[in-house]
Amino acid sequence: MKHQRVPVMILHSKGTMASWPFSRLWSISDPILFQVTLVATLLATVLGSCGIPPYLDFAFPINELNETRFETGTTLRYTCRPGYRISSRKNFLICDGTDNWKYKEFCVKKRCENPGELLNGQVIVKTDYSFGSEIEFSCSEGYVLIGSANSYCQLQDKGVVWSDPLPQCIIAKCEPPPTISNGRHNGGDEDFYTYGSSVTYSCDRDFSMLGKASISCRVENKTIGVWSPSPPSCKKVICVQPVVKDGKITSGFGPIYTYQQSIVYACNKGFRLEGDSLIHCEADNSWNPPPPTCELNGCLGLPHIPHALWERYDHQTQTEQQVYDIGFVLSYKCHFGYKPETDGPTTVTCQSNLEWSPYIECKEVCCPEPNLNNYGSITLHRRPSTSTHCTYISGDKISYECHSKYMFDALCTKHGTWSPRTPECRPDCKSPPVIAHGQHKVVSKFFTFDHQAVYECDKGYILVGAKELSCTSSGWSPAVPQCKALCLKPEIEYGRLSVEKVRYVEPEIITIQCESGYSVVGSENITCSEDRTWYPEVPKCEWEYPEGCEQVVTGRKLLQCLSRPEEVKLALEVYKLSLEIEILQTNKLKKEAFLLREREKNVTCDFNPE
């Protein structure tokens, strides 16, 4: 196929005409469309074609389309559909040769006018006021809508208008409130009541109101005024006061109750409430919820403890009729002449199984039978009672005689012991033993049983053993004590003791150890002896001269153990100098003493009688 030559075209910016070089017969009213058409025509000779153009919601072709294929560059002019207006001069579609029609939206929806404000209501705009849009109308609380609840922007002639006019919102109205039997309301004789109005009902005497006393005019479904809630009714309601065993009323005292009156119950001490404590009188003359019950929640009465009595609690005496809470503790004590059988608290506790805990029994107090050992006899026995299995019980009194010359009395106490002591006759004892470095004192001049001797030691001695001895059937008891010597702590220069104490007791032994460089002169072990001295005598700690050291002795000892001869020489010179100083000081003291004696010789005593 032979391609045609494309002629040159010149467009005038200010004119509406375009000329071909070989003809002046072409006249173009729309230069832009002409230019686009020309370019599309030129492209069509090179590229492909397009199918039927797409359907547009906002526009349709000006000319009827009879073809199904269009060459590249074909331009189709469109016009806006009803409800739309043109927004661009490029109201056409162009075939781009790739089977696509290219265009930019050139029509927009027309807009309806602002519907205005709705008195006592609201205009709800879903999107905007454009063609096809919807608006809704609603009224404020207490108002009803008269008219359409919505409106649409629709076509009319060549323009767009709202389908429905602006409605009205008028205040809701209710019919007069209903009348009720055996009651009335406080409203007037008005033909109607506006939204928010209320009336209050009251019942005739002896009638109870079932329901709410006041009702109000409300709006139902946003369309009609109704009374809410429903009017009450008046009915004779009588509830009889229920009896709750082991319970009591704390609020709402009757005995006759009407509708919705209430009672509050509580249980007596030791009982547990089962059910609701608050009940109401209902319209059917019954109580709702049902009256509660009081269940036992403690220990009823007191346990029987023989030979015991209960102690007072909160200044009150316990009784068999009382109920005691779980965990409640009661104390008891045994009768006179009785005591707890075992050690432990004399209490009982109310347990969770509503039973009392086990208790310690009270056992009769018995005193032991006197053992006079054939040295005496009981002369009198006075007892408070004979109903006992004991020979001697609490309160018994006896008199007994020992050695046919000593008389004693004894009382059986509540603790099962004799007072002042257990009756006993023992043989007489000889004089208490004599001990070295000590002496004894006796309580009585007769050394009879139970008499005592008290020992004490001389100064510088300490008692070892029992201080007091008693006269028993086997003699003086316990063993005779001893008086042991006390030795003072030895003072040893440069030494230390194995046991450091202020005083040491005969025959205590200590060991002496000397400090480093010193050795023990004497016995290392010394013993505290009976004469309060150390035996052997206390040792000394003396200096031990190391091997290879120089020694100088002149009235005292000086030892220098030095490594170099120069140091040894210096030490000896220092020692020599110290000796010279000591000699000078001694001579000075001697001279001063001589002068003092000379002055004393020259002192005379002058006597002047005047």
Curated annotation (Swiss-Prot):
InterPro entries: C4bp_oligo (IPR040514), SEZ6_CSMD_C4BPB_Regulators (IPR051277), Sushi/SCR/CCP_sf (IPR035976), Sushi_SCR_CCP_dom (IPR000436). Residues 49-109, 110-171, 172-236, 237-296, 297-364, 365-427, 428-485, 486-543 form the Sushi domain. It comes from the Eukaryota. It is found in: Secreted. Disulfide bonds join 50-95, 80-107, 112-153, 139-169, 174-217, 203-234, 239-281, 267-294, 299-350, 334-362, 367-412, 402-425, 429-471, 457-483, 487-528, 514-541. Transmembrane segments: none annotated. Pfam families: C4bp_oligo, Sushi. One of its GO terms (cellular component) is plasma membrane. One of its GO terms (biological process) is T cell mediated immunity. Glycans are attached at residues 66, 221, 525, 602. Keywords: Complement pathway, Disulfide bond, Glycoprotein, Immunity, Innate immunity, Repeat, Secreted, Signal, Sushi. Residues 1-48 form the signal peptide. Controls the classical pathway of complement activation. It binds as a cofactor to C3b/C4b inactivator (C3bINA), which then hydrolyzes the complement fragment C4b. It also accelerates the degradation of the C4bC2a complex (C3 convertase) by dissociating the complement fragment C2a. Alpha chain binds C4b. It also interacts with serum amyloid P component. Disulfide-linked complex of alpha and beta chains. PANTHER family: CUB AND SUSHI DOMAIN-CONTAINING PROTEIN 1, PROTEIN CBR-CLEC-78. This is C4b-binding protein alpha chain.
